[in-house]
Amino acid sequence: MSEIPGILPSQEMDAAIASGVISADLAIPDGQVQPASIDLRLSNTAYRVRASFLPGANATVADKLKNFTMHKIDLTDGAVLEKGCVYIVPLQESLKLPADTSGMANPKSSTGRLDIFTRVITDGAAEFDRIEAGYSGPLYAEISPLT
């Protein structure tokens, strides 16, 4: 990966995928890598939780889900998510970032047009949408339909 600070171009994203820095349950299709980003994909399960949360230092999202899950929803054939509810969905992609590489996430514009609030959570996170340098682990989406 580049020694120059800034956003990784698609060529470096492709190299990160090839080297296992970015990996996924299913192969990452070419169209998923954009000029300076990668589109993250939902897994087949959503967990309805009482409220939004961050795991905090030394805690995992999976451990928090054991305590906070109200319902488990199969997304395989699609599902309707309830307005005003909070869902946590594991993403297909995971990361093994080098110690000098961090990440940021932001929703696609289509989520705003659909009036859905989304953000990314990582294990040990104290902040949404920020992935600490050297992070190694799964990624999760918090999804809250607004209308």
Where do the protein language model's features map onto the residues?
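Non-catalytic terminal segments and appended small domains
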Residues: 1-147
